[in-house]
Amino acid sequence: MAYPVQLGFQDAASPIMEELLYFHDHTLMIMFLISSLVLYIISLMLTTELMHTNTMDAQEVETVWTILPAAILILIALPSLRILYMMDEITTPSLTLKTMGHQWYWSYEYTDYEDLCFDSYMTPSSDLKPGELRLLEVDNRVVLPTELAVRMLISSEDVLHSWTVPSLGVKTDAIPGRLNQATLMASRPGVYYGQCSEICGANHSFMPIVLELVPLKHFEEWLLSML
């Protein structure tokens, strides 16, 4: 989860988020090299006293500055497209969770089981227990198994919302009348926090998301207690 004065990403807890972190580092390194080259050329232009008054064209330079940017864009685009398809691809999900956004709470439905649905509201600050996080705790947490592919079906009943859990690399818009799909698979147990990431009204800041990822055995025990 996030911590005060954090400048980087949250720790990755899913294969998708790990890929996103690798892609971020890959792109950042390319940007660093380009920026260094530009600064080097600018410093040369400011310090050199050499002048070429008879230069009319430079075919070699024009060829290089056309091909090189194209190659750099390809180096960025290929891993980006790979991750994009990974995020959308889900063939055999072990579980399906339907999420509906409301003003200003979330409702969840485990579609593989009958009558397993609940609403999730933010816990007021006055009701927080010691150790709980202000504006991030909810009255009903979403419990899911680890190391299993979960298909998220996300929509809204009123306005635009966005269901986001940074540690898992999930951010999907909840659009009224449209059912969006996302893939979720946690690589380790834990409690993961998120929030609505689309301005949706006066209480937009009070729509937290809490996922409790547990081993399959504990998930089955939780299911039995809920059914």
From Swiss-Prot:
Cofactor binding: number and manner: Binds a dinuclear copper A center per subunit.
Annotated GO biological process: ATP synthesis coupled electron transport
Cofactor(s) annotated in UniProt: Cu cation
Residues in coiled coil: none
A Pfam family assignment: COX2_TM
Catalyzed reaction equations: 4 Fe(II)-[cytochrome c] + O2 + 8 H(+)(in) = 4 Fe(III)-[cytochrome c] + 2 H2O + 4 H(+)(out)
TM spans (from-to): 15-45, 60-87
Record localization: Mitochondrion inner membrane
GO CC term (a single one): respiratory chain complex IV
Ranges facing Mitochondrial matrix side: 46-59
Stretches in topological domain Mitochondrial intermembrane: 1-14, 88-227
MF annotations from Gene Ontology: copper ion binding; cytochrome-c oxidase activity
Residues annotated as binding Cu cation A1: 161, 196, 200, 207
Topology term for the membrane: Multi-pass membrane protein
Amino-acid positions noted as binding Cu cation A2 in the UniProt annotation, renumbered to this chain: 196, 198, 200, 204
Keywords: Copper, Electron transport, Magnesium, Membrane, Metal-binding, Mitochondrion, Mitochondrion inner membrane, Respiratory chain, Translocase, Transmembrane, Transmembrane helix, Transport
Keyword Transport: yes
EC annotation from Swiss-Prot or TrEMBL: 7.1.1.9
InterPro entries reported for this sequence: CcO_II, CcO_II-like_C, CcO_II_C, Copper_CuA, Cupredoxin, Cyt_c_oxidase_su2, Cyt_c_oxidase_su2_TM_dom, Cyt_c_oxidase_su2_TM_sf
Gene3D superfamilies, per the entry: 1.10.287.90, Cupredoxins - blue copper proteins
Residue positions binding Mg(2+): 198
Assembly notes: Component of the cytochrome c oxidase (complex IV, CIV), a multisubunit enzyme composed of 14 subunits. The complex is composed of a catalytic core of 3 subunits MT-CO1, MT-CO2 and MT-CO3, encoded in the mitochondrial DNA, and 11 supernumerary subunits COX4I, COX5A, COX5B, COX6A, COX6B, COX6C, COX7A, COX7B, COX7C, COX8 and NDUFA4, which are encoded in the nuclear genome.
Annotated function: Component of the cytochrome c oxidase, the last enzyme in the mitochondrial electron transport chain which drives oxidative phosphorylation. The respiratory chain contains 3 multisubunit complexes succinate dehydrogenase (complex II, CII), ubiquinol-cytochrome c oxidoreductase (cytochrome b-c1 complex, complex III, CIII) and cytochrome c oxidase (complex IV, CIV), that cooperate to transfer electrons derived from NADH and succinate to molecular oxygen, creating an electrochemical gradient over the inner membrane that drives transmembrane transport and the ATP synthase.
Family under the similarity heading: Belongs to the cytochrome c oxidase subunit 2 family.
Name the UniProt record assigns to this protein: Cytochrome c oxidase subunit 2
Organism: Lemur catta
Gene, per the UniProt record: MT-CO2
